[in-house]
Design a protein with these regions (language model features):
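Short glycine-/small-residue motifs
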Residues: 121-124
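Conserved active-site tyrosine of GNAT-family acetyltransferases
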Residues: 18-23, 91, 119
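Alpha-helical macromolecular-interaction surfaces
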Residues: 16-17, 86
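Vicinal oxygen chelate
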Residues: 1-6, 28-81, 85-115, 126-131
Length: 131
């Protein structure tokens, strides 16, 4: 039996703040997400979900928050380096913490990192065009 990745989720403190961030990032978060404790979004063949700590505690009451360093990195691909740079400027302009300003990792790959409202690192990536 082949193993397949089915879901990736983020446990959030405040659904309103999380939904707002991920919408600004470009994720098609449902319009009623703020009134929910768990929302699922189908993306690129898998399901991305946001779930409140309160909802998660029902399934895993002994779980405690991680501390220090990365808990998870979510990578979202943008089609151009200009789109990556613009998205980084947009998100940091709204007050989200820019963890790492846009930079070229290799001659063909560009990265930037922004922290979501819960401190999860979101990696933005794009291919760099060769002229």
């Amino acid at each position: 039996m082949a193993l397949g990745l089915y879901m990736v989720g983020v446990i959030v403190e405040d659904m309103h703040r999380a939904a707002e961030f991920y919408r600004r990032l470009g994720v098609d978060v449902p319009g009623d997400a703020e009134s929910q404790e768990h929302v699922e979004i189908s993306m690129s063949g898998l399901t991305f979900f946001l779930s409140t700590k309160r909802a998660n505690a029902r399934w895993d009451p002994a779980r405690t928050d991680a501390s220090g360093g990365y808990r998870i990195i979510l990578e979202f691909y943008l089609e151009t380096q200009a789109a990556l740079d613009a998205k980084y400027e947009e998100l940091t302009g709204f007050g989200y913490v820019g963890h790492c300003a846009p930079y070229d990792v290799t001659p063909t790959l560009r990265f930037a990192m922004v922290d979501d409202p819960d401190g999860n690192t979101v990696l933005l990536s794009a291919s760099v065009r060769e002229d």
